[in-house]
Amino acid sequence: MSSEDREAQEDELLALASIYDGDEFRKAESVQGGETRIYLDLPQNFKIFVSGNSNECLQNSGFEYTICFLPPLVLNFELPPDYPSSSPPSFTLSGKWLSPTQLSALCKHLDNLWEEHRGSVVLFAWMQFLKEETLAYLNIVSPFELKIGSQKKVQRRTAQASPNTELDFGGAAGSDVDQEEIVDERAVQDVESLSNLIQEILDFDQAQQIKCFNSKLFLCSICFCEKLGSECMYFLECRHVYCKACLKDYFEIQIRDGQVQCLNCPEPKCPSVATPGQVKELVEAELFARYDRLLLQSSLDLMADVVYCPRPCCQLPVMQEPGCTMGICSSCNFAFCTLCRLTYHGVSPCKVTAEKLMDLRNEYLQADEANKRLLDQRYGKRVIQKALEEMESKEWLEKNSKSCPCCGTPIEKLDGCNKMTCTGCMQYFCWICMGSLSRANPYKHFNDPGSPCFNRLFYAVDVDDDIWEDEVED
């Protein structure tokens, strides 16, 4: 190796190491060579797809995805002793998403670039071409069809093959080739199957999007602080960004209040909802367990064929058979009516507790004719009638009577003074303040100047003035 070639190689490798970061260029340890990773800049809304008639049978054949990043092309090279004065670098070009024919076309163009730069270093020109011109050179546009090269059609050639050999570049969808494909030995599509390729592309795209997000600055719309993306989180549907500290507090408040269905984007009127994975990343394990449990319960509540065991010590979900009102808990074996949640009673009407009479009456009054018939069938007409009558009586008593302060018996006052006597327990009480009166001297309450009802024995009593005047004249 001449000293000029040696110096040129060292300078070129040093320049590449200073231009590119460690993820894009790595110098080999034992030989004059290295590895470069070429990350292509894709146009916006770039789509990839697999056609339904692909050679490989896929469960999701015919799918289409919009991506922002594709896995890099990898150029591995070794510099011979007489580079750059006489010989080109020996290299291999590998990529997951380009077919062997397309990679071979790129290899051929790298050879042409060497011929143009013969006698001078060429690695930077190669890397710039691969990064900036690959898509245009191969006529790749969106949507781009993913394909795996068929090894049965491949006739490999060596790097010393005739330069006059023409290669089919392929297009955006990798057009069909009538003649046998010729593939360069240096072109490697390093992927096992089309299904693996799809998953690798999607995983890489997601990882790169996260990496770009983490390195940018965002303004949190809650605390109005500017923070790195690594300290922020975005909602997947709307892409609204907030800092993790604010979202953590927001999620914790909602979960403690039991509002697990309301972990929406804080942006007004935005319907985006946080995923369970995002919630788990921000809140503590105990709160996430509560969130997970309440979310499952709310989901089960939306299922018409799921009820809960009414036993307080159990409360496990029970599947309800269609057309059957009996539920049997698989945990405690309790048989219950799925309508009233009491012990199963066969064809007998459901029993209604006093607390539920008001709800039953309101439900019946607001129901249409069809729902009224269902309620009559479920509870029985006598129970419905009883509910209506009892609630009417209760409303009348609340409006026209007061309860005895001693025994609670409803008392109606028609006329007379405000000293009342309970018909149930015979207790004296004041109709104005509802206080109990002394049995020895019940009128002291109205004669005592310190009493709030002083001189109010006949307060609010309607007296016929004409009769009173007649009695005075007599």
From Swiss-Prot:
Protein task: E3 ubiquitin-protein ligase that plays a key role in the RNF14-RNF25 translation quality control pathway, a pathway that takes place when a ribosome has stalled during translation, and which promotes ubiquitination and degradation of translation factors on stalled ribosomes. Recruited to stalled ribosomes by the ribosome collision sensor GCN1 and mediates 'Lys-6'-linked ubiquitination of target proteins, leading to their degradation. Mediates ubiquitination of EEF1A1/eEF1A and ETF1/eRF1 translation factors on stalled ribosomes, leading to their degradation.
Keywords linked to the UniProt accession: Coiled coil, Cytoplasm, Metal-binding, Nucleus, Phosphoprotein, Repeat, Transcription, Transcription regulation, Transferase, Ubl conjugation, Ubl conjugation pathway, Zinc, Zinc-finger
Catalytic residues of the enzyme: 417
UniProt similarity note: Belongs to the RBR family. RNF14 subfamily.
Sequence motif D-box, residues: 37-45
Pathway(s): Protein modification; protein ubiquitination
UniProt keyword GTP-binding present: no
Residues that hold Zn(2+) 4 according to the record: 337, 340, 345, 350
Region (Interaction with androgen receptor): 361-474
Residue numbers spanned by region TRIAD supradomain: 216-457
Binding site for Zn(2+) 3: 309, 314, 329, 332
Domain-related comment: The N-terminal destruction box (D-box) acts as a recognition signal for degradation via the ubiquitin-proteasome pathway. Members of the RBR family are atypical E3 ligases. They interact with the E2 conjugating enzyme UBE2L3 and function like HECT-type E3 enzymes: they bind E2s via the first RING domain, but require an obligate trans-thiolation step during the ubiquitin transfer, requiring a conserved cysteine residue in the second RING domain.
Entry comment describing in which tissues the protein is expressed: Widely expressed.
Residue numbers carrying Phosphoserine: 348
PTM info: RING-type zinc finger-dependent and UBE2E2-dependent autoubiquitination.
Protein's name in the database: E3 ubiquitin-protein ligase RNF14
Residue ranges of domain RWD in the record: 11-137
GO cellular component: cytoplasm; cytosol; cytosolic ribosome; nucleoplasm; nucleus; ubiquitin ligase complex
Signal peptide: none
SUPFAM superfamilies according to UniProt: RING/U-box, UBC-like
GO terms (BP aspect): androgen receptor signaling pathway; positive regulation of DNA-templated transcription; protein K6-linked ubiquitination; protein ubiquitination; protein-RNA covalent cross-linking repair; regulation of androgen receptor signaling pathway; regulation of canonical Wnt signaling pathway; regulation of DNA-templated transcription
